[in-house]
Amino acid sequence: MIPEERLQSVIARFEAVQSEMNSDVPRDRFVALSKEFSELEPVAAAIGHLLARRREYADAEQLLRVRDMAEMAKEEIARLNEELPRLEHEVQLMLLPKDAADDRNVILEVRAGTGGDEAALFAGDLFRMYERYASNQGWKVELIAASEGEMGGYKEIIAGISGPGVYAKLKFESGVHRVQRVPVTEGGGRIHTSAATVAVLPEAEEVDVEIEDKDLRIDVYRASGAGGQHVNKTESAVRITHLPTGIVVAQQDEKSQHKNKARAMQILRARIFDAERERLDRERSAARKGQVGSGDRSERIRTYNFPQSRVTDHRINLTLHKLDQVLEGEALGELIDALIAEDQAARLAAMGDEA
């Protein structure tokens, strides 16, 4: 049971925010208060509902001592015994510390791994899956860079996805995705295994990551197309190396050097921000023990088996026999929701261990 003082402190904060919003405050302060208000409002409502039911339970226990009311009180207690655990659980989930990046937009990177042309085709399948899922969520997808495979698909594709709660939903997609199927180039009908790597990076603002000019090496060169031939006569392509971390980003998809540099800096900032978050996560690894996956890019997280039309997420041992619907982006939400639920359960258990 959540201590009442913990619940009352949330309601007190909600009322304080509400009161301050009604006073004369600077615009930037009002914007910050409005954001906090919108986050606290559903939590305060759920807590109010829970506290009301707790009071009803206490009243019913008192009525047990009144002979004429005892039977009705027993029925009331039985009803509340069913309702209260559900309400407690809902409020517990709402009180879990939020990942500060959950509301951020993301940079999605999909790269072909082992498997040559087939891996590039699979990388294309994965990107389209995320594109369709994003469309169903009402999010916006903007292509940043793409290197196409010789037989289709992508050797690498990078896109920005923006909308409410993007990182919260997609953050568990990072890792190695494996496919088992008969490639279009396979005449003997043998099943091959290929892989693609997905990275979901929360988009970083300049205030999140301080990058000094002295820490950058910027090289410019002529953009090249398939086969290595130069596709323009100006040095519009940009490669930026962040010397302290060794992170390198190259960008040539835009026609102007200025735009390519801006794109490269956007990706670089996100990668540095993500690397710092990973470092902090490792330092908190004891607290994170048991949570969904490690976020390790080399961790095999999911297998897509075409002959059996199944998708298995290895982190939570969940198998769906609806591969087509997953790749269409329709059933991907079932996997994502299950991963979020598992993560919440693990964090609740960790909070219980600490209590």
UniProtKB/Swiss-Prot annotation:
PTM characteristics: Methylated by PrmC. Methylation increases the termination efficiency of RF1.
Keyword Protein biosynthesis: yes
Molecular-function GO terms, alphabetical: translation release factor activity, codon specific
Keywords linked to the UniProt accession: Cytoplasm, Methylation, Protein biosynthesis
Pfam families documented for this protein: PCRF, RF-1
Residues with PTM N5-methylglutamine: Q229
Main subcellular localisation: cytoplasm
GO CC annotation: cytoplasm
InterPro entries: PCRF, Pep_chain_release_fac_I, Pep_chain_release_fac_I_sf, Prokaryotic/Mito_RF, RF-1
Function summary: Peptide chain release factor 1 directs the termination of translation in response to the peptide chain termination codons UAG and UAA.
Protein name: Peptide chain release factor 1
Lineage: Bacteria, Pseudomonadati, Pseudomonadota, Alphaproteobacteria, Hyphomicrobiales
